[in-house]
């Protein structure tokens, strides 16, 4: 066969022995003779199995499959023209002044002078302050104050929960639910059993039925707490069912207000599909401003949002230059969604110091999309094998072996991965490139079985499909290098606790693979890609309907999300919480894109709204 001209020994196998040698690459066969000769083989090569409705002939005469995608939704001139005045020193100075004022408020919460903090409300007020700065996206300024406030609340935590204040005689649903959620998210050992105290003698959650604003807010916080459930917590499942029904009923009765808008938002996005920056923007719009401290909280949130918007402009322009430099606009067969991926990154990493994370995440996510379109749709089998070999060789000289449309892609991957490894070395104090290359080999190898399934029309079993596709989905690629730039040293043995095949990474990969399939399988099938978790599940369970298969897979996802909650918050993890949270938020932001439909094949209304509200449009002051 002509392909014998390329001989590359794989760096690693696909077994778990991947990590047996942390930084030492396996041997590579250095002899790849006459690479330029491979270009002679490009014409007349059989392509991947073609769907009659999505095929096209390229200039090279090869009949190829193409996706029915719309292309760049965001005019480059618009991006270049984004203007902002929020980098002016006056805004930075105002932000600093507001931060100090809010710190003073935190530090004065122990003062009982009738004006500030009553022993009948001090617990709830502390929780409310912590929850407010977190939801407004300004909590990075108050980490010490948050810890002090939560230590205080936890010192009064009881088996039946807490009241509004340390001297409250009766436990309170609002305070207990908000406390359960907030303390759990910060690693305090609190049990969901406290919610049993709010059931009636029949074991059912109950409320007065009057639906006052206070009661509604209590049930809203019960709903928010129920989403931070761990596996086996039946009371949390019951709380979610009860609170969801209650809040939907309340929406039918209460007038349109800040409270109703908040309820609608949270019922729609919950927690696992709720991007932090989008929630911050919503919360600014509905946040109460009855007191001077509430006004200062909102003002700081808005000023910080717009200062960050100035930074987003520069980063997005930098990303667009990178995108153009490697010729991605000329690739007509792939999705042009680099702006969307930058938006995703900036929705979950809002600290201005995390620029490397945001740009690395956007670039790695875009690579995954382009390679998915090449391997699943556009490339011929021979071209795919050549590209796979080139990635393993990791040498820019092999670019001459590749067809024209692959050359820029290969050099972009090569240059960018190397560049990001240098960024990571500044944080990690060691060269992580070899480790990252191993991840890329495993990832790129996983594409080949799927390409062969498409070519042959083979439909694998559900488990066979999942074992391979959770790697080919590319989650590891989008997580690994970004978290290495976060500022937290990750020794190899700790990195293994969050990187594939550790359970944390495995869960994220499976969740996104399954959820993505429930949104994409029909469009994929129309392009000739039959294998999906839906079709494979139906194959394994003869007689089941497509609708039932989707329902079963969604149930799997919901159960896996509870496991992911535990992996994020379990007390014995050695991985820094900032890295766990970043990986978890990557899952959340991709899950957001699949909320109602495939947000990646063609940018949906929801994804476009996310770009506008979190990147393109500043908040009115």
Swiss-Prot record:
Extent of motif DDXXD motif: 372-376
InterPro entries associated with the record: Isoprenoid_synthase_dom_sf (IPR008949), Terpene_cyclase-like_1_C (IPR034741), Terpene_cyclase_plant_C1 (IPR044814), Terpene_synth_N (IPR001906), Terpene_synth_N_sf (IPR036965), Terpene_synthase-like (IPR050148), Terpene_synthase_metal-bd (IPR005630), Terpenoid_cyclase/PrenylTrfase (IPR008930)
Co-factor binding details: Binds 3 Mg(2+) or Mn(2+) ions per subunit.
Top class in the EC scheme: lyase
Source organism superkingdom: Eukaryota
Molecular function (Gene Ontology), one example: terpene synthase activity
Residues binding Mg(2+) 1, per UniProt: 372, 376
A Pfam family annotated for this UniProt entry: Terpene_synth
Keyword vocabulary terms for this entry: Chloroplast, Lyase, Magnesium, Metal-binding, Plastid, Transit peptide
Subcellular localization: Plastid, Chloroplast
Cellular component, GO annotation: chloroplast
Enzyme Commission number(s): 4.2.3.52
Residues binding Mg(2+) 2, per UniProt: 372, 376
Reaction it catalyzes: (2E)-geranyl diphosphate = (-)-beta-phellandrene + diphosphate
Residue range covered by the transit peptide: 1-49
UniProt pathway: Terpene metabolism; oleoresin biosynthesis; Secondary metabolite biosynthesis; terpenoid biosynthesis
GO terms, biological process: diterpenoid biosynthetic process; green leaf volatile biosynthetic process; terpenoid biosynthetic process
Disulphides: none
Cofactor annotation: Mg(2+); Mn(2+)
Domains: entry comment: The Asp-Asp-Xaa-Xaa-Asp/Glu (DDXXD/E) motif is important for the catalytic activity, presumably through binding to Mg(2+).
Purpose of the protein: Monoterpene synthase (TPS) involved in the biosynthesis of monoterpene natural products included in conifer oleoresin secretions and volatile emissions; these compounds contribute to biotic and abiotic stress defense against herbivores and pathogens. Catalyzes the conversion of (2E)-geranyl diphosphate (GPP) to (-)-beta-phellandrene and, to a lower extent, to (-)-alpha-phellandrene.
Family, as annotated: Belongs to the terpene synthase family. Tpsd subfamily.
Official protein name in the record: (-)-beta-phellandrene synthase 1, chloroplastic
Upper lineage: Eukaryota, Viridiplantae, Streptophyta, Embryophyta, Tracheophyta
